Amino acid sequence: MFRAETFEADATGHLPDQKVLAAKITEMGKSLEALRVAPITDPYNGPAILSGRAAAGFFHEVLGHRLEGQRQRGDDEGQTFTKLLGKQILPSFMSVSDDPTLKKFDGTWLSGHYYYDDEGQQARRVDLIKNGVLDTFLMSRLPIAGFAHSNGHGRAEVGHMPTGRQGNLIVTSSKTV
């Protein structure tokens, strides 16, 4: 079993104090104990409601990576959305953008913030899906068919070439529950 808590800040002075950290440790301990004694359930396949970090992780992994430009390039990348440009891929009440210019959102520091990408291009908001319709991809300077220019999302891991990557993926909905 594993439990972790992460804190995002632009400087150490913005991290939680010892009292908050101690409370989180106690909370994680209680959560682990509850998991340890919880009954094992059968796998579930059906609708789910996600919130908070679970929703963020889901959209980052399942949708965000598929919208990175290099994922449209080769067969080995899946090309999930390559032929769906201009088509409905989400409900019309949902839109998705990526905005590395945001430092904070609702009081939370965002780790995807940057001023310039790893190719020297100025960071900027990109509206990827508008009202459910796929509009564009996250691009570096390495072109793909139909996209000759960077949109400020060229990011690289140490020792690797920059590719179109997520900064701060923002999912919005005009319908809420």
Show the residue positions of the predicted features.
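Generic signal for short, ordered secondary-structure residues
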Residues: 7, 75, 79, 105-111
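Amphipathic alpha-helical
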Residues: 68-93
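Internal alpha/beta scaffold segment
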Residues: 1-69, 136
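Dual-mode signal for accessory low-complexity, basic/Gly-rich regions
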Residues: 84-177
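Short N-terminal helix-initiation segments at or just after the protein's N-terminus
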Residues: 58-76, 156-162, 170-171
